[in-house]
Amino acid sequence: MRHPGGISHDHQTETYIIVSGGGTLVTGGRVVNGRKSGPDSDVTKVLNGPSCSGAIAGPDVVKHVVKTGDVIIIPAGVPHGWTDITDHVDYLSVRPDPDRVLPAGYINPLMKKPF
């Protein structure tokens, strides 16, 4: 049995707003043989804070078929990943910072680059 790949974030809740396309979002379970993001990596410092990526497995893994207009909230610590994307899935990822880890006025460095 092949397990889908995914990631979990130690402290970061994410909200996905599906703006076009769709696929199957896998949540739950646990990350097996995961790789922790390095303390100075972009994943940790810019994107999601400390995270762990690898295969997702376990009896509580749930597959959600999502489509344009769906909104999904993924709590911190919950493994998640994509599978069965037939064409594409575009989504807006919202990552709130209720603990105010980021400095006031923070702008993601990727947003400072021209498109």
What are the functions of these language-model segments?
Residues 87-105:
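A short hydrophobic beta-strand segment most commonly corresponding to one strand
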Residues 10-25, 29, 40-53:
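Short, conserved beta-strand element in jelly-roll/cupin
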Residues 103-115:
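Extracytoplasmic/periplasmic copper-protein system
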Residues 34-66:
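Double-stranded beta-helix
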Residues 1-6, 11, 59:
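N-terminal post-signal-peptidase region of extra-cytosolic proteins
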Residues 65-85:
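Conserved metal-binding segment of the jelly-roll/cupin
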Residues 6-7, 14-17, 63-64, 71-72:
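His/acidic/aromatic-lined binding-pocket segments of jelly-roll/cupin-type domains
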Residues 12, 19-22, 27-31, 78-79, ...:
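A mature extracytoplasmic/lumenal domain signature
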